[in-house]
């Protein structure tokens, strides 16, 4: 294969360096796909990126048991009832066909959520897939929660991840965004709060702008999900 050809050329370079008395202290060449599929490319180190997130570099390599470690979550900030024939979001790109309950999610392209998901993506609310209504705006996205029982302001929203046994993979979000999962993971905005977990215990809460002073809300949310999963 082309990858093995490149490894052979790299080996030849290392041999030429060694012949001149030059030996790099560490040698590395393999990304996630190379680590999984090209044993000769492992050397001293490997540079796994996507695999470190528990994701596969391609569908053909799904034989390694990996579990996604990252999710993107928010909460409904508004729930409104609209009649049939009402327009939702900018430019009247969505019109309700029935009496519809709309959930407003405080995430938009300003947070790194792709505008291309307008009228085509989904989010999880109440363990159900809810379609995006109209355009994704800079700070808000609307979803159809008509069929979600007892939906209310404050309910959790999953933009990618798992909720109530239902999965919304980041790969699906990437496909709807006409890009790769790599880019989705890398383009989540700086102001989005990150909750870091080690061995089922929250260890840090921050944004990429700085440390977050108030840990309580994201930590409480995580502990609630962890305990519910353990009870199930």
PLM segments and residue spans:
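Active-site loop/helix belt of alpha/beta enzymes
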Residues: 1-75, 79-83, 149, 205, ...
